[in-house]
């Protein structure tokens, strides 16, 4: 299932997503951060999505997958299989199986769209040129850097208020 899903999703994943992806590494994420801050000094929001893998909403993930019914049923079965702790089985109503081969891909699918969502919201921020004129929405979007490695991400911008507004999102 992973071998079938991964190429499809790799073709659409956001450009600044680095964790658990073929041909991408933590070094690539660090290079992206370095490139962003080398252009201009920037404020940084360093964030971690708390218990991300444990809290993935099964229903939303399955809706987002939009794949063959057979794959959906299999993935749903994996997600709902439960977790063994000793001899006791605990049901799972959310999250991905820890250590599961497909879990990192499912987490990336669940988080896909975060970068575009934040950049889309940034279009409405009050960002101005030094002369007081409002920046175009395209420049506003490009000025916000979001770099994600699995459930860790940074948001970089030269204006601290923009970073704070992104944090609220």
Placement of each model-derived feature along the sequence:
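Active-site substrate-recognition loop segments, prototypically the cytochrome P450 B′-helix/B-C loop
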Residues: 2-7, 11, 20
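Conserved polymerase palm-domain catalytic core
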Residues: 12-169
């Amino acid at each position: 299932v992973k071998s079938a899903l991964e190429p499809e999703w790799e073709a659409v994943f956001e450009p600044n997503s680095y964790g658990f992806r073929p041909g991408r590494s933590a070094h690539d994420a660090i290079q992206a951060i370095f490139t962003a801050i080398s252009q201009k000094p920037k404020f940084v929001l360093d964030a971690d999505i708390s218990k991300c893998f444990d809290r993935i909403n099964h229903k939303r993930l399955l809706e987002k997958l939009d794949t063959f019914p057979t794959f959906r049923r299999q993935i749903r079965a994996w997600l709902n299989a439960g977790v063994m702790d000793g001899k006791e089985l605990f049901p799972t109503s959310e999250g991905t199986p820890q250590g599961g081969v497909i879990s990192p891909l499912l987490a990336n699918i669940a988080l896909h769209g975060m970068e575009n969502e934040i950049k889309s919201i940034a279009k409405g921020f009050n960002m101005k040129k030094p002369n007081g004129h409002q920046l175009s929405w395209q420049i506003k979007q490009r000025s916000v850097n979001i770099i994600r490695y699995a459930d860790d991400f940074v948001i970089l911008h030269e204006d601290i208020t923009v970073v704070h507004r992104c944090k609220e999102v």
